[in-house]
UniProtKB/Swiss-Prot annotation:
Zn(2+) binds at H68, H133, H199, D279. Part of the ATP-binding cassette (ABC) transport system TroABC involved in zinc import. Binds zinc with high affinity and specificity and delivers it to the membrane permease for translocation into the cytoplasm. Residues 1-22 form the signal peptide. Disulfide bonds: none annotated. Keywords: Ion transport, Metal-binding, Periplasm, Signal, Transport, Zinc, Zinc transport. One of its GO terms (cellular component) is periplasmic space. It comes from Treponema pallidum (strain Nichols). The lineage of its organism: Bacteria, Pseudomonadati, Spirochaetota, Spirochaetia, Spirochaetales. This is Zinc-binding protein TroA.
Amino acid sequence: MIRERICACVLALGMLTGFTHAFGSKDAAADGKPLVVTTIGMIADAVKNIAQGDVHLKGLMGPGVDPHLYTATAGDVEWLGNADLILYNGLHLETKMGEVFSKLRGSRLVVAVSETIPVSQRLSLEEAEFDPHVWFDVKLWSYSVKAVYESLCKLLPGKTREFTQRYQAYQQQLDKLDAYVRRKAQSLPAERRVLVTAHDAFGYFSRAYGFEVKGLQGVSTASEASAHDMQELAAFIAQRKLPAIFIESSIPHKNVEALRDAVQARGHVVQIGGELFSDAMGDAGTSEGTYVGMVTHNIDTIVAALAR
C-alpha cells in the first residue's frame, strides 16, 4: 500500500515535471524570486536566516510531523515539481520520499544537506547506515547549515555577498547556542545526565554533551517497542531511580505514559519531565518554532526535570 502511494506520487511528478519545464516556476511568481522547498523545519529555519526575503520558501513538514513516517501528498508533489531548489536532511530520515527526490534530481538542484557531514563524524547504526538526527549536536548541524548556504549561493550567485553575511551571523548564533547547551549540561552531576525519551533520537546529543540516552522505540519511529523493551527500560529507570522521562512533540504520548506506569509498578515514582522537540520544531511564531529556540527549550526542560 505504501509503495503504491509512493509510485503514484512519482507518476504524478513525471507529469508535473513536464508542466513546470514548459512554464517555469519563476514565471509563476510575479516577483521572479526562486522557490525553495524543504522537508524538516530545522532546514527551513536555516533558509529563513540566510536567504530571508530573497526566495520563496515552502516547508513541507510542520510542527508535530514525524519525518520517518511522512509520505508526500499530491500537494507536496506539486510544490516539489515547481521548486528551483529542494533541501532535505537525508541519511534515510525522509525514507518514504526517497523515490520522489531521485526522480527530481538532475532536473533541478536537490541537496541532502546532512549527507555533507564527514562519514567519520556520523553515528553508525545496526538497523540503518547512519543516525539521521544530526541537529541534536549543534556543532555537527553547522555542516548542514553550510550546505544550505552553499546551495543558496548556487541558486542565486548574485546574492552571495548578502548570503555570506547572514550565514556568518547565523553561525555565530549557533556557536553561542552550542556553548549554552554545554554549560547547562555540565550543571548536572554526571549521574543525573540520563535521558529517557520516546524514541532513540538523541544519540548525537549524548555524544556531544555527555548524556546517557535511552529510547523506548528505535532510531526510526517506524519500529514498535515490544512488551519486553518496555519492561527492560522500566527496570533500568527504577534501578537508577531516575526522576523524569520525556515525551516528544512528534510522537504520540501513550507509550511514554505506559512506561511511567510500568516504572511505578516497580515501586519507583517517575515524572513526565516535559515535552521535547525531536524530529519537528514548535509552532510558527513561538521561540520553539526556531532551531535556536527549540534546542534551548530542550536543554532547559531536560536540566530542570533531571535536577529535581
